[in-house]
């Protein structure tokens, strides 16, 4: 019975620690950007995260992989010049 209680407490501590870190990242912004919620297309925008990416990197999908990391796994991609993702230097994160 003690082991179940200890396991439950460890799981709660890990979950609390993870949620605290995620909340802290959201409040402070991650590195160089502050995520802004775009109302028109429903995508959160991470400004300037695709700066300096060349066409070879975009072809290899490296930019989109980078954006998925920036978007904390919710899925994301770099702008493509369309009306939904106009700025090619920004990451656009999918809403959860």
Swiss-Prot record:
Phenotype when changing residue 47 to A: No significant effect on inhibition of host Nav1.5/SCN5A activity
Predominant cellular place of this UniProt entry's protein: secreted
Annotated keywords: Disulfide bond, Ion channel impairing toxin, Secreted, Signal, Toxin, Voltage-gated sodium channel impairing toxin
Signal peptide as annotated in the record: 1-19
Cysteine-cysteine disulfides: 26-71, 50-78, 63-91, 67-93
Effect listed in the UniProt record for changing residue 30 to A: Reduces inhibitory effect on host Nav1.5/SCN5A activity
Domain of life: Eukaryota
UniProt-reported outcome of changing residue 58 to A: No significant effect on inhibition of host Nav1.5/SCN5A activity
Annotated consequence of substituting residue 25 to A: Reduces inhibitory effect on host Nav1.5/SCN5A activity
Subcellular location: Secreted
One term under GO cellular component: extracellular region
Entry annotated with the keyword Secreted: yes
Further remark: Intravenous injection of the protein shows anti-arrhythmia effects in BaCl(2)-induced arrhythmia models in rats and monkeys.
Role: Salivary protein that inhibits host voltage-gated sodium channel Nav1.5/SCN5A.
Protein name per its UniProtKB record: Salivary protein FS50
Organism annotation: Xenopsylla cheopis
């Amino acid at each position: 019975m003690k082991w179940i209680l200890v396991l439950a407490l460890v799981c709660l501590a890990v979950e609390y620690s993870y949620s605290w870190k995620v909340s802290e990242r959201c409040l402070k912004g991650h590195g160089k950007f502050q995520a802004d919620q775009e109302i028109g297309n429903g995508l959160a925008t991470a400004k300037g995260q695709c700066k300096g990416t060349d066409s070879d990197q975009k072809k290899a999908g490296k930019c989109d992989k980078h954006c998925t990391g920036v978007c904390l796994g919710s899925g994301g991609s770099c702008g493509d010049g369309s009306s939904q993702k106009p700025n090619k230097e920004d990451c656009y994160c999918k809403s959860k």
